[in-house]
């Protein structure tokens, strides 16, 4: 089993030293879903929400969140992301919105946390914008879909 890299020999939280690593291209994709009533989803899809374009706002929030992951998660490194993409898809057959994020850089550490943060914050933003009409929306299935680059190699979720 692989060791926990953020815990030092004394069992204390520790930021990993990546200074000796080579720069490589790293990429990660993540997803999240938010479920809601059909009426709430229809309001989003029709553009009739009084707060404006829900998807555009969630997309920008996800991008901003990816860039600030290091400020939210204590042991994440500040990263110079070269690409952040957040795509939102309405799924009327299941009354959900699927959010998929992509983060990319050339650097010494991976971008999994940035991709997960982007998808999560985009979902939270949808919740925030729609909570006035529905409070029981459910954010679910936040997960890493794929990562490549770095010493741990290529990962694809089952």
Curated annotation (Swiss-Prot):
InterPro entries: MoaC, MoaC_bact/euk, MoaC_sf, MoCo_biosynth_MoaA/MoaC, Mopterin_CF_biosynth-C_dom. Pathway: Cofactor biosynthesis; molybdopterin biosynthesis. Homohexamer; trimer of dimers. The keyword Lyase applies. Transmembrane segments: none annotated. GO terms for biological process: Mo-molybdopterin cofactor biosynthetic process. The active site is at residue 128. Its EC number is 4.6.1.17. Catalyzes the conversion of (8S)-3',8-cyclo-7,8-dihydroguanosine 5'-triphosphate to cyclic pyranopterin monophosphate (cPMP). It comes from the Bacteria. It is an enzyme of class 4 (lyase). Keywords: Lyase, Molybdenum cofactor biosynthesis. One of its GO terms (molecular function) is GTP 3',8'-cyclase activity. Substrate binds at residues 75-77, 113-114. It holds the Pfam family MoaC. NCBIfam families: moaC (TIGR00581), PRK09364.1 (NF006870). Belongs to the MoaC family. This is Cyclic pyranopterin monophosphate synthase. It catalyses: (8S)-3',8-cyclo-7,8-dihydroguanosine 5'-triphosphate = cyclic pyranopterin phosphate + diphosphate. It comes from Actinobacillus succinogenes (strain ATCC 55618 / DSM 22257 / CCUG 43843 / 130Z).
